[in-house]
Amino acid sequence: MASRRKSTTPCMVLASEQDPDLELISDLDEGPPVLTPVENTRAESISSDEEVHESVDSDNQQNKKVEGGYECKYCTFQTPDLNMFTFHVDSEHPNVVLNSSYVCVECNFLTKRYDALSEHNLKYHPGEENFKLTMVKRNNQTIFEQTINDLTFDGSFVKEENAEQAESTEVSSSGISISKTPIMKMMKNKVENKRIAVHHNSVEDVPEEKENEIKPDREETVENPSSSASESNTSTSIVNRIHPSTASTVVTPAAVLPGLAQVITAVSAQQNSNLIPKVLIPVNSIPTYNAALDNNPLLLNTYNKFPYPTMSEITVLSAQAKYTEEQIKIWFSAQRLKHGVSWTPEEVEEARRKQFNGTVHTVPQTITVIPTHISTGSNGLPSILQTCQIVGQPGLVLTQVAGTNTLPVTAPIALTVAGVPSQNNVQKSQVPAAQPTAETKPATAAVPTSQSVKHETALVNPDSFGIRAKKTKEQLAELKVSYLKNQFPHDSEIIRLMKITGLTKGEIKKWFSDTRYNQRNSKSNQCLHLNNDSSTTIIIDSSDETTESPTVGTVQPKQSWNPFPDFTPQKFKEKTAEQLRVLQASFLNNSVLTDEELNRLRAQTKLTRREIDAWFTEKKKSKALKEEKMEIDESNAGSSKEEAGETSPGDESGAPKSGSTGKICKKTPEQLHMLKSAFVRTQWPSPEEYDKLAKESGLARTDIVSWFGDTRYAWKNGNLKWYYYYQSANSSSMNGLSSLRKRGRGRPKGRGRGRPRGRPRGSKRINNWDRGPSLIKFKTGTAILKDYYLKHKFLNEQDLDELVNKSHMGYEQVREWFAERQRRSELGIELFEENEEEDEVIDDQEEDEEETDDSDTWEPPRHVKRKLSKSDD
């Protein structure tokens, strides 16, 4: 590249020093604030041995960055800071704007209005997408020349072959110098930035620097194809890429004439992770934008924390930063647009709630633009949704925003958003973006999506994006009324609720499931007693409600707990005596409320449908509660003995019950033995079996139902120590009757086959509940550890969890027990204490009783117990 000569004195090129015939306006680039000279071919007025020094221009500022700084040619202002110089020109010289014209080179069409050029393109170039706009300055007038270039099949652009002819023409064929790099090579290690051309009026003077020698680079024009012109009603401006030899700079152009399209592009993914992808915007085109705010650390820190400040935060920032609230709001909007941050109001509120636990105000409307050419390929990379926020003038033309260094890009994207879309188009194009995570640095919101985006409906389920919508009071009221009728709704009821509430089937089912769960947790802490008042909660397992008799299965007693803990109870206004009389008469006539009766009651009582339905539901509950209480009283009268305390540890391992004011139900060992034997036979007794157990044991039916529910819960969590012993007993005896054993089977050698001594010949087994409690011994935790130690001789950490579950001991207790055995082994003393073996000792008499056909008590043999303790199914 040719060498560059720099002046040592800060200066601005005067208008008289510029070529009045033809001037090229350099485009914008992004990077650190260092000017990048780029070689550019010129027209006839510039000789081949001269070099055009690319400098940063805007509509109302002319400057050149040299070693000393910047100097204004209209006054004596000088500064080494580019932002301060920009602010000075914007505020002191706002009227340096020239007229502009638009020329279609293909048709020789000339107009002063950009809208007229767009209409011309729609009429005479329908379907054409590859427009190129070159901005030149001729005779103190800015001219935009529109040409058309073609795109090759691989995504690269056709190289202009007639470069020599282009040099001889009055205007250079390309107003922007670019490299020959094809589009597929944009993700290389070199720092490559997308460049944009902004449609604005050029400045009066163009600073340039001439050299004696120059090595012109071969050029290739790259355009960014726009979307369909019929959809956007705007045309696309050129988007070029360039390989800068040095770092490039970001300079804000001057004010843009109203109605001109603004081209927004993004920087390609950088190797340096600190460089965030940004969108270049003509910030001076935004009203009251103050570039001096870009270096304010307070504002930058606030933006990095959260890109959407509230009005109170803006007020505080205005007082601290000494800028107006309007300037700060405009600055935040420009920063969000530059960084590609575009959240919906719901997303902003959700993000603020997660980070600050507060609320935010609404933000401007957002539209999601989907690059259709990016699709899921064989490498599994998902498609990308890009969002943009409409700020300032309509007619934004968007280009591709690169995500990561590994994202393959097959062609540049030019997506056009119509300035004023119709309502239907807006609804079809609005796709909620994913909830952006509040990070220290903002990033473009992007979510994976399928290759084909469905536009059939404008409403998208928030749960699919991780956003759980809050239900309204009306929806909750309908759900509560339905829940009081039936805690397990049928499909028809779910469909009805879907139509009324507008919720999905999954949301309704989840609400019912959560409510049942909360109800069970509330019930588990309530006390159950027999001689109770009407406010006592009767614990009924949820799984039994579908198999119980109607009296028990569908009864909803008056509850002291709130079945909807996350919402306040529904309240209705008090009813008059006349209304109560009409409702009572209707209920006595028919307790089932029909639609005709409901309409009649609404007209007669002037009550709402929900109030009438709730009154009937409460009435049914109170009626069923009275019947349940009468049934409990009858069961108590039939019980002949006072119930004592429970002694079995298995029952204690069930669901916990806390004390209450009433008398807690106690079960005798005989009753517990009956229930446990029945539980081993079936965990889900039928209503007839419940009645039989209630009659034989003398317990209330509700007590039995509650016990089975608690025991099932304990069994599910592995807390039933007695289950395997009863299961073994049940396998050898059906319903309490001994089964005949095969003679000699399982007897040790030397043991006789006859009846043991001292046993009567014809004794009969009596009912279990008429005799004493069974002498069933349980393996303690140390016994299980002893069996494991005798088998393995040491503790394997992989088996630690299993030993803890079996022995019901803590992790440290198990480790200490094995450490003690190891210590005893090293000292040569007895490994096990005598009291540890007592639980395992079963005398010969008990074993004989087990093997006889007519023994009164039953105990599983020792080998069965050891086998069960080792397998622990």
Swiss-Prot record:
Organism: Pongo pygmaeus (Bornean orangutan)
Composition bias type Acidic residues, residue spans: 831-857
UniProt-annotated location(s): Nucleus
Compositional bias per record (Low complexity), positions renumbered to this chain: 223-236
ZnF endpoints (C2H2-type): 70-93, 102-125
Main location: nucleus
Entry keyword annotation includes Membrane: no
Keyword Repeat found: yes
Source organism, top-level taxon: Eukaryota
Spans annotated as Required for repressor activity: 831-873
Family matches, as PANTHER family: ZINC FINGERS AND HOMEOBOXES PROTEIN 1, ZINC-FINGERS AND HOMEOBOXES RELATED
Compositional bias ranges of the Polar residues kind: 550-562
Bias (Basic residues) ranges: 740-764, 863-873
Phosphothreonine found at: 36
Region of interest (Required for dimerization), ranges: 272-432
Protein name per its UniProtKB record: Zinc fingers and homeoboxes protein 1
